[in-house]
């Protein structure tokens, strides 16, 4: 019961924070401020291209790199995840971050390298600093769900 209450409080807090952020930004979601779906697709596509070329992390993405079809599918899934995460209308049907990364041995260094790739992609697309910071904070909040420690990899 306690876990349920904590979960409800966390969900309510995130929704309240999201609504507060929209009010502060003239009612526009981060999705809208980033430029909508075309911008989200550009972020996802560019990020996947960067990840697949990044020798620090590409070993975790061999399936995505195994064929053009798999690369495109991964880009589409990532775009849906980003879209949903920044308040867009997309439906994300993929796994949650814990399930998607369980047993993969993702290190803090690998997470940071992907975050660096994302930051460079946002810079290339000339995303304003405020929105870039919000995206990077969202990504940072995912780190505990993605990075594997001895306790989480079991």
Residue ranges and their predicted role:
Residues 1-8, 16-17:
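Bacterial N-terminal signal peptides that target proteins for export
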Residues 8-9, 149:
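A periodicity- and composition-biased signal for non-globular, repetitive helical segments
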Residues 13-21:
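C-terminal segment of classical bacterial N-terminal signal peptides
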Residues 20-154:
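Core of compact, soluble alpha-helical bundle domains
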């Amino acid at each position: 019961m306690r876990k349920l209450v904590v979960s409800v409080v966390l969900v309510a807090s995130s929704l309240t924070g999201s609504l507060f952020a929209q009010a502060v930004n003239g009612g526009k979601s981060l999705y809208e401020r980033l430029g909508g779906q075309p911008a989200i697709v550009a972020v996802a596509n560019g990020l996947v291209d960067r990840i697949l070329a990044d020798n620090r992390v590409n070993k975790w993405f061999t399936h995505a790199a195994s064929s053009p079809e798999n690369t495109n599918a991964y880009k589409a899934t990532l775009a849906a995840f980003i879209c949903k995460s920044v308040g867009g209308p997309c439906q994300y049907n993929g796994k949650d971050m814990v399930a998607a990364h369980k047993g993969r041995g993702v290190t803090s260094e690998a997470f940071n390298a992907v975050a660096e790739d994302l930051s460079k992609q946002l810079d290339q697309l000339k995303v304003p600093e405020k929105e870039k910071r919000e995206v990077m904070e969202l990504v940072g909040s995912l780190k505990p769900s993605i990075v594997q420690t001895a306790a989480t990899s079991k």
